[in-house]
Each structure stands twice: as C-alpha cells, then as structure tokens.
Amino acid sequence: MMRLYYFLSFLLLPIYFVIIFIRLLIGKEDIRRVKERFAIGKHRQDNRFLIWIHAASVGESMIALNLVDNISKHFPEVRFLVTSWTQSSAKILSTKLPKIATHQLLPIDNIIFTKIFLNNWKPDLGIFIESELWPGTINEAAKQCNLLLVNARMSDKSFESWKKRKGFFQLIVKNFSEVIVQSERDLQKFNELGISNTTNLGNIKFANEKLPVNQEELIKLSEHLKNKQVILFASTHPEDEEIILPIIKNLKKQVIDCYIILIPRHPERIKSILDNCIAQDLSATAKSQNDLPVLTDDLYIVDRFGEMGLFFSIASISFIGGSFKQGGHNILEAAHFSNCIIFGPDMSKNTDIAKGVLQSKAAIQIKSGEELLNMLEYLLDPNNSRELKNYQENSLKFVERNQKILDEYLQIITKFFP
C-alpha cells in the first residue's frame, strides 16, 4: 500500500508544482520561502538532541510554542525544528520561536523531498500535533527516529472516512511509538481503527499558556476604549461574517456603548471583508490603516498576526469564529483572559472542550445570527451584569483547573530522551 502511495506521489509530481504555483498566485505561499516546499533550506547545525515538532496551522502552532517553552525549561540543551504548513502559522512561528528553535515549512509529501528534508535535519524525536497525517513523511521519518502523535483528535467525518481505509490508516499511525489522544471519544475511535498504543490525557490546549500581550499597546488601547463594552469576533471565516455583519447595526442601536472588533482567521482577506462591510452599509477601519479604532466606526478589523491576546485583554465578550460551519476554533485562548465566550452550532472539531465549558457554565452556544444578537443584547443589559460576570469568572476557572495536563504530556514525551 505504501509503495503504491509513493508511486502515485511520484506520478503527481508535476501537479504538485502547479499547485504550489497557484498557491503563490493567490497569496497562500511566500515566494521568499517557497523553496522550502522542495526541501531546499536550512539544516541541522550540531549534535545536540533535536526534537522535530510538526504543527499544521495556527492552533497547533500555539501548542508547539508551549511545548518548546516547557521542554526547554527542563532540558536547556535540547534544540528544536518546528515545521508547519500554512502561511499564517509560519508567520507566528517565525516571530515567536526562541533562538533554540528553527522554523521551516514542511516539504511536499513526496519521497524525494521528504528524504532530502530528513537527511538535512536527522531529528532524534518527532512530534506530530493533532490530526495532519502525511503518509510518506511519517513513514520515512519513522525509519530515523521515534515518532509521537500528541493531542490526537478525529472528527466524526474523518472517522467514517478512515473506516473505509482502515488498513491504510493502520499503516500510517502504527509508525508512531505513542499516540496521545485528547478525549475518551477519540480514544474509542483510534481503538476501533486498530490502534492500541493510545493514551487519553485530555486536550493539551487546556494547558496552553496565556497569549502574549504588548503592555504598552494595552494601556493605549484600554484608555482609548475606556467607556466602551468591547465585543470581539475572533478567528472569523466568510461564513461567520455572513451572519455577524448583518446584526451589527441592530446591536449598536440597542447597545449604545458597545464597540465591535473583528479578527479574521486569515488577515489576507481584509479587502473582501471591507467590501462586505460597505455592502452592509457598515463603516470599518483596518488596523493596517489605523493603529487605534475609529470610535465613530461600526467596527474595527485587525488584519495583523500575533495580536489576539491584546484584543482578548480588552474584550468583555468574545465570539469564537469557525463555529457556524468549520467545526470551531480554540475557545480557551479567550478563557485565559476571563472573557464571556460565545460560539455557534458547529464545534465538531472541538467537541470535548465545548462540552466541558458548557457544563461549567463558562460559555454559551447559539444556533443562529438572531440568537447571537439576542444573547449579546441580553448580556450587555446592565440588569444582567452579574450573569455576564459569572460567565467571565467561570471561563477563567475552567482553564486554570486544567493546567496539569501539560505535565502529564511531558512525562510521556521525555521517556524518549536519551
């Protein structure tokens, strides 16, 4: 089966080049770094123990940063290679990784580029985060070092798909020395697919450290918005904005002192978002146009990476994007800042976190734009200020209770150290 995969990936090599070229044209690749997709780039510098961590996108990248930080505290001699796939994660990792770590884009999953990449780096331990499984890369890497799959999760859709290709799934995942899943539900799915070397430690995102905040910026922003109730729409997709933008006018009519801030999941969409605002008769300014919100505008759009923590710091309520159709994003980043958290009907990629925060009365789930509008108006009514405060306090308590998970992950990871 793996030989067939290698053969097909070799035949598809010309198509890979076309795909990368198209991604360049639409802004999903950085021309300065595109060579890394073909394993042309940096290489290992010394013989110190090297841990390779692969983080597909932004959420996984935050976990990778946390792992690098905590492992290096206990093992300062260890060095790290962190790979990712998306440009958004690349920008975050390139700016936030410490000097003991190097970031590189993951090469295309083709045996030629994979072997060059592994020969350049020769990792001593590989850690893959969550659910991105590149068959060729994993199979070749397992020949060189132990591999761990951490915070593993599987959506119901993926589970049904893998059941039809159970043998191939086993061929990939059995390359991992340990599989650490994030919930009992995920454990059952992996076991049913024939993977027995699994452990459920819970979701390591529970243990993610608080997002960094520029204190000078925070003071300036807080002073600027001191008389406003800030509502943050975080990590939004076009499908979220189709629902959010039409309710903003009504919300601002009902709640005079509220101010809306929107942070798209992909800031490169800023032009289309501004165009949609105009179509909805909304006045909006992007952060790239003005460092501070224009108070007479209907909303402020943050089109820069790495500033989520700053805006969680000033928000009273945060709606977490991707929760109408994309399966949801990380709720817990907002919980660290004691926000009242709201999310939509689709949390299929974060089922257990969603269930946990709802049971703890640390978040609110809505089903539609109308429900969202009604809930925001209700929470911002001065008569309901105590209820709003309870949600804010409960969100922080929830995330604080789960900090021990990281220590349990590190106990397993460090078993594979020399």
Swiss-Prot record:
One of its GO terms (biological process) is lipopolysaccharide core region biosynthetic process. It catalyses: lipid IVA (E. coli) + CMP-3-deoxy-beta-D-manno-octulosonate = alpha-Kdo-(2->6)-lipid IVA (E. coli) + CMP + H(+). GO terms for cellular component: plasma membrane. Its EC number is 2.4.99.12. It is found in: Cell inner membrane. Coiled coil: none annotated. InterPro entries: Glycos_transf_N, Glycos_transf_N_sf, Kdotransferase. Keywords: Cell inner membrane, Cell membrane, Lipopolysaccharide biosynthesis, Membrane, Signal-anchor, Transferase, Transmembrane, Transmembrane helix. The active site is at E60 (proton acceptor). Pathway: Bacterial outer membrane biogenesis; LPS core biosynthesis. It holds the Pfam family Glycos_transf_N. GO terms for molecular function: Kdo transferase activity. It is a single-pass membrane protein. CMP binds at P264, R265, F305, G306, E307, N330, I331, L332, E333. The chain crosses the membrane at residues 7-27. It comes from the Bacteria. The record marks E130, K205 as: Transition state stabilizer. Belongs to the glycosyltransferase group 1 family. Glycosyltransferase 30 subfamily. Involved in lipopolysaccharide (LPS) biosynthesis. Catalyzes the transfer of 3-deoxy-D-manno-octulosonate (Kdo) residue(s) from CMP-Kdo to lipid IV(A), the tetraacyldisaccharide-1,4'-bisphosphate precursor of lipid A. This is 3-deoxy-D-manno-octulosonic acid transferase. It comes from Rickettsia bellii (strain RML369-C). The gene is waaA.
